[in-house]
Amino acid sequence: MNAFRSLFPSVTQSGCFYHFSQCIYRQVQQHGLQNDYVSEDFSLFIRMLAAIAFIPITDAVDAFDTSLIKICFILHYKYSKHKNYSAEPVVNYFEDNFIGRPDKRGNRRNPVFPLTLWNVNQRVVESLPRTNNSVEGWHCGFQSSLQCSHPTLWKLLDQLIWENELHRLTVAQLLAGQTHTVKRVYRITNERIVNVVADYNNHTFAEFLKGIAHNLQL
């Protein structure tokens, strides 16, 4: 990633929200919390962690500090009397990698992944994709069309020429006004997320994060 940034300094790097959310859920699995994830309270909290990606970058750290930590301790207190239950390992992972842990002076260290990489608020505002699923889908389809893992140079060139013609046709269809259909369930979910983001200033951090979290699946 650093090498890419040095070679293309003017390019804006944006991470994939799907892979971002999967990183969080893998921590749930790693710490043996899959059964706890069935609980609506715990599941909502984990999804609220992922929902921080939809908060404006300037407010993301404050949202983490004022909302998520408080809810984490409430959950810990609620369940710790009954079993060894805590969301703290997931919160620690999130803070180290995406927020930055405070040093002795109270200043936050740089996280492993900067906020500008995983925050998708502006992408929602500008109606830009939040994942690279379409790219991965194309790669999968292209590999399937080759019908082998190591094609000859000529077979690869023939398939690239064919793909180019297909994309020329797609561009022509778009210019003619043909629209790309999206499954109803995805369209409705996206519309809800857009509405919550647009109404950001009328909610507290906790309300906003819950609103986004109700529309997320990890």
Each model region followed by its residue ranges:
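Extended amphipathic alpha-helical interaction segments
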Residues: M1-I188, V196-Y200, F205, L216-L218
